[in-house]
From Swiss-Prot:
Subunit details: Homodimer.
EC supergroup of this enzyme: isomerase
Keywords: Isomerase, tRNA processing
Gene, per the UniProt record: truA
Entry protein name: tRNA pseudouridine synthase A
Claim: Metal-binding is one of the keywords in the record: no
Record bears the keyword Repressor: no
Physiological role: Formation of pseudouridine at positions 38, 39 and 40 in the anticodon stem and loop of transfer RNAs.
Entries under Gene3D superfamilies matching the protein: Pseudouridine synthase I, catalytic domain, C-terminal subdomain, Pseudouridine synthase I, catalytic domain, N-terminal subdomain
E.C. no: 5.4.99.12
PANTHER family in the cross-refs: PSEUDOURIDYLATE SYNTHASE, TRNA PSEUDOURIDINE SYNTHASE-LIKE 1
SUPFAM superfamilies in alphabetical order: Pseudouridine synthase
The organism of origin for this protein: Borrelia turicatae (strain 91E135)
Pfam families cross-referenced by the UniProt entry: PseudoU_synth_1 (PF01416)
Protein residues bound to substrate: 110
Length: 245
């Protein structure tokens, strides 16, 4: 029996998140169903992170044990041939038994897409958050800069998040303009449930209302969930990459 690491990508639009839920379509459920069909035995997968309902991934990492003797190239082809079109295996490789996708991860990168141009095709908003008012990217980046370092992110946590420590380290946070979109990129040690979406929602709200950028710092330092305001929609969030070095 060998342990396999898989890099996967998926469109989360039609799924109730990554983690298995009874009688609901999930990314984990779809992959485990396919692996069971191939190996003729139940296989449980472990992931680097559990994305929420509607969230997408370009570089999610999972691991699982496989008993059958098969070349990884053929295994990848077999899995992808049985998976639905909105979930794909990008690559497979063998790893040591001690490897844990979640606990061995050093950093994670997320991207959030904001559609900020009224002259757009309707489908461009399917996986982006449409904001009608022209956003000032310089003001947004002033707020993003306040995230760098180690902070207590209680303000941007969710009541249902049972994580003991709300302290997280952010290494990079930046808004970038790309055609009709403004893309928020953030790299951190790990993230709380709905944390990225809460951060984006507050920053956009401050910008739309033309409040002082320091308002964001006050909200961050308050450790008060009631100041979170609006949570940005899940459909525009992507897990881009998981770093292990």
């Amino acid at each position: 029996m060998k342990k396999v690491l898989a890099k996967i990508t998926y469109d989360g639009s039609l799924y109730y998140g990554f983690q298995i839920q009874p009688k609901k379509p999930t990314i984990q459920g779809e992959i485990e169903k396919v692996l069971e069909k191939i190996s003729k035995t139940k296989i449980k997968i472990h992931s680097a992170g559990r994305t929420d309902k509607g969230v997408h991934a370009r570089g999610q990492i999972i691991s699982f044990y496989i008993k059958i003797n098969i070349k990884l190239k053929n295994l990848k082809t077999a899995i992808n041939s049985l998976l639905k079109d909105d979930i794909r295996i990008i690559k497979l490789k063998y790893v040591e038994d001690k490897f844990q996708p979640r606990f061995d991860a050093k950093r994670r990168k997320y991207s959030y897409y904001i559609l900020n141009n009224e002259n757009h095709y309707p489908w461009e908003g399917y996986r982006a958050y449409y904001v009608k008012k022209k956003l000032n990217i310089n003001r947004l980046n002033e707020m993003a800069e306040m995230l760098i370092g180690i902070h207590d992110f209680t303000t941007f946590s969710c009541i249902r998040d049972q994580t003991n420590s709300k302290l997280k380290e952010i290494y990079y946070a930046r808004f970038k303009k790309k055609n009709k979109f403004i893309i928020f990129e953030i790299i951190g040690s790990s993230f709380l449930w709905k944390m990225v979406r809460s951060i984006v929602g507050v920053m956009i709200d401050i910008e739309i209302k033309n409040e002082p950028v320091d308002t964001f710092k006050k909200i961050l330092n308050s450790k008060n969930r009631k100041l979170t305001r609006k949570t940005a929609p899940a459909k525009a969030l992507f897990l881009d990459k998981v770093f292990y070095e």
